[in-house]
Amino acid sequence: MRPFRLGLTGSIGMGKSTTAALFAEEGVPVWDADAAVHRLYAPGGALVGPVAALCPAALKGGAVDRGALRDWIAADPTALPRLEALVHPAVAADRAAFLAHARTDIVLLDIPLLYEKGSEAEMDAVLLVTAPPVLQRARVLGRGTMTEAQFEAILARQMPDREKRARATHILETLGLEAARAYVRALIAHIRETADA
């Protein structure tokens, strides 16, 4: 029997990583699209050579430098679609390998661009994590890893939160850790009860 596939999505700064960690604490295997990209870009990763062929400046120390890729994407309007043509099939293959080895009743698939890339059809349900815009902005800019302009550029590429809310099966407002933990536990129990019915 294949596991129940719960997709986890939400815009940047909404609490996806924290929510995924809560599922992992409950014993639910988590596949993370961003982590898959990091593995593929790391030394020896399957995308190092192909990405370096597209953007030689992105090759640093045998790995793909994401900062150099961001600069390339900002400077060349044709860069992102060419990069995605390499990345998305490789990430899909990584996800398929994870699913092929999953021996559990539920898996969580953490996919930031789940709706934008049409992955929702592969899910049994989708959990959207969300937060008020002021909290989202504070979380992202408080990390100190990007500028406000970079944050706005990422938001512009992501589907608006209100559209995601309309499409999601489940919605979690990530306002506090204990409330989120309780929600995750209740959702896991609900999925298991529904599967047993």
Curated annotation (Swiss-Prot):
A single MF term (Gene Ontology): dephospho-CoA kinase activity
Alphabetized CDD domains for the sequence: DPCK
Compartments reported by the entry: Cytoplasm
EC number assigned by the record: 2.7.1.24
Biological process, per Gene Ontology: coenzyme A biosynthetic process
Keyword Magnesium (UniProt): no
Top-rank EC class of the record's enzyme: transferase
Keywords: ATP-binding, Coenzyme A biosynthesis, Cytoplasm, Kinase, Nucleotide-binding, Transferase
PROSITE patterns: DPCK
Family classification: Belongs to the CoaE family.
Matching PANTHER family: BIFUNCTIONAL COENZYME A SYNTHASE-RELATED, DEPHOSPHO-COA KINASE-RELATED
Functional summary from the UniProt entry: Catalyzes the phosphorylation of the 3'-hydroxyl group of dephosphocoenzyme A to form coenzyme A.
Identification of the protein by name: Dephospho-CoA kinase
